[in-house]
Regions:
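N-terminal Rossmann-like NAD(P) cofactor-binding subdomain of oxidoreductases
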Residues: 2-316
Length: 316
């Protein structure tokens, strides 16, 4: 082999080694401290070796060049020695502030992350989440919640659906395993038909059969103070969605469709400041609205928009 070929292979091997050492550090920080590490907005949790290297390649869109994974490894290793409170830390933005790669990383982190050390903020509590409905939106939400189940944030406890014939739970588990856009579920799914549960990786999901929101007692399943995510779209006004709040164990309702009447339609990053602590029912608007609004707002704020046309393509 030529010297250039050998050098490229050696460089790739070093990146692989750094990525292999990074992966358990990222996972441990999430499970033990509820610290989610990202790289310019992209989560590093549960990345493969190649995925971790690709994430550093992606950084060139922000830095003008690929981010050195060795620097990230030094930063994350130092983070592991800090007693951090729950936080979301963007390593890309953090490293941008590191003028000298050879600087004292411990001192740098102590200054930059002074607000998230454990002594200043206790570890957060988990919050029960129930998916009312298990269509495509519900299943994609389930994937996200399952993927992030190791921390102390949202914890998927149950799904509520109508029974649809024999082996209903088996069919629903099969749909969770496969998605036409996002592909196969990354992990293990085990169905317990006798107890009506689905275990997805380490998350035990109770399947509750009900025809109406007002029929469910969540406390009977050990679920309390839960956020009910209604992804059926059947009830969209305050009167209909309030049925969820009448159930023991439910405290908040999030609708994944456009709300009607006085229900606030919220797009995160655009108008989420409108949410008040006293709001018990909020709509996350539609898929289309969430897809177009952030981009449209940025364009409108910068250049102005006179009119537009939107087309949507649905998957299953």
């Amino acid at each position: 082999m030529t010297d250039a070929t050998t050098a490229r292979l050696d460089d790739w091997a070093k990146k692989q080694t750094a990525a292999e050492e990074l992966i358990p550090l990222v996972g441990r920080l999430y499970r033990e401290n509820d610290v989610l590490l990202t790289l310019f907005g992209r989560s590093l949790l549960n990345k493969s070796v190649t995925g971790m290297i690709k994430a550093h390649r992606y950084a060139r869109h922000f830095l003008g060049e690929e981010l050195d994974i060795q620097i990230t490894h030094r930063i994350v290793k130092a983070l592991s020695g800090l007693n951090l409170a729950p936080a979301r830390i963007d390593l890309g933005r953090l490293i941008e502030k590191l003028d000298d790669p050879n600087a004292d990383v411990d001192a740098f982190l102590a200054a930059e992350l002074a607000g998230v050390v454990e002594s200043q903020s206790g570890k957060g509590e988990t919050r029960d989440v129930v998916l009312y409905g298990f269509g495509r939106i519900g299943r994609l939400l389930a994937r996200i919640l399952i993927d992030r189940a190791g921390g102390t944030g949202m914890r998927l406890r149950a799904i509520v659906v109508r029974r649809n014939g024999d082996s209903d739970i088996v069919k629903r588990a099969s749909l969770l395993r496969r998605d036409s856009v996002h592909g196969a579920f990354d992990g293990s799914i085990v169905v317990d038909e006798e107890n009506n549960t689905i275990q997805a990786n380490g998350t035990l999901i109770q399947v509750i059969y009900s025809n109406d929101p007002s029929e469910v007692d969540y406390t009977a399943y050990g679920i309390n103070d839960a956020i009910i995510v209604d992804n059926t779209g059947k009830w969209r006004d305050e009167e209909g969605l309030s049925k969820h709040l009448a159930c023991p164990g439910a405290s908040k309702v999030l609708l994944t469709a456009p709300g009607k009447g006085d229900v606030k339609n919220i797009v995160f990053g655009v108008n989420d400041e409108a949410i008040l602590d006293s709001d018990n029912i909020v709509s996350a608007a539609s898929c289309t609205t969430n897809a177009i609004t952030p981009v449209l707002k940025a364009i409108n704020d910068k250049f102005g928009v006179r009119n537009g046309h939107v087309e949507t393509v649905h998957s299953f």
